[in-house]
Design a protein with these regions (language model features):
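Inter-domain helical "communication" segments and dimerization helices
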Residues: 1-21, 40, 112-115
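Short, leucine-enriched amphipathic alpha-helices that occur as contiguous helical runs
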Residues: 3-11, 58-66, 89
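Basic, amphipathic alpha-helical hairpins
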Residues: 10-25, 45, 49, 66-75, ...
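Residues within helix-turn-helix
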Residues: 28, 39, 76-79, 89-90, ...
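The alpha-helix within a helix-turn-helix
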Residues: 31, 81-82, 93
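Central "turn" residue of the DNA-binding helix-turn-helix
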Residues: 35, 85-87
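Terminal helix-turn-helix DNA-binding modules in bacterial transcription factors
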Residues: 47-84, 110-115
């Protein structure tokens, strides 16, 4: 029950407060924001998502960036990367490619062709 409550609080915080959009937001800050310790948060996230704390943060960043890429606006890949909480375009490209199997630029291009 304690893990479920902690997981629910983590989800709510990520969805509503968008803490992950700050490039400096990390495992330590997440633990502090939830008033818990790293052991409990690690256990809760592993149980409910199968992810580590850092992977969970990156998951939210990628999901947010993915949504931004689908919006046909003039924002550059760099602007989307930074708005999503990545500290560099290189880091964004690497993480995005691991999830989607292509760069954000290629993903955006392919999606635009389908529209």
């Amino acid at each position: 029950a304690q893990d479920k409550d902690l997981y629910n609080r983590a989800e709510k915080m990520m969805r509503e407060d968008l803490l992950f959009t700050n490039p400096d937001f990390n495992r330590k800050e997440f633990v502090q924001a939830l008033y818990t310790n790293e052991h409990y948060l690690t256990r809760a996230l592993k149980y409910y998502t199968g992810m580590s704390i850092q992977d969970y943060i990156v998951h939210y960043r990628i999901d947010y960036a993915h949504t931004c890429l689908l919006i046909p606006d003039a924002r550059s890949i760099e602007e989307i990367a930074l708005a999503s909480g990545f500290s560099s375009v290189r880091s964004f490209n690497r993480n995005f490619s691991e999830v989607f199997g292509m760069t954000p630029h290629k993903y955006r291009k392919e999606h635009a062709n389908k529209a």
